[in-house]
Amino acid sequence: MTNDYGLVSIITPTWACAGFIAETIRSIQAQTYTNWELLVQDDCSTDNTKEVVELFAQSDNRIKYECNDRNSGAAITRNNALKRAQGRWIAFLDSDD
């Protein structure tokens, strides 16, 4: 598939999804369209979600992790990631989908 359609910013809000987030990231990496950035916005997880995401980010610079200053809920978490988005297109993908 051609990548001429522009950058897609995939926003993934997360909270305590260490058990699911790796599969979510792998599903994005497996897409045929490769012009994307993944913005994982953590709502102050208490598990090792951060470590899982950062492990992927070490080998794929399209993956970016950020954590809220405090637990804020899904809407604020999505909006925080949206502020960082660089893409022409925005897609939302929950971390447990």
Which residues fall in each region the model found?
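Acidic helix N-cap motif at the loop->helix transition within catalytic regions
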Residues: 19-22, 47-55
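Short aromatic/hydrophobic "clamp" motif used to bind/position activated sugar donors
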Residues: 90
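Short loop->beta transition adjacent to catalytic acidic/histidine clusters or analogous donor-positioning motifs
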Residues: 5-8, 29-40, 48, 60-64
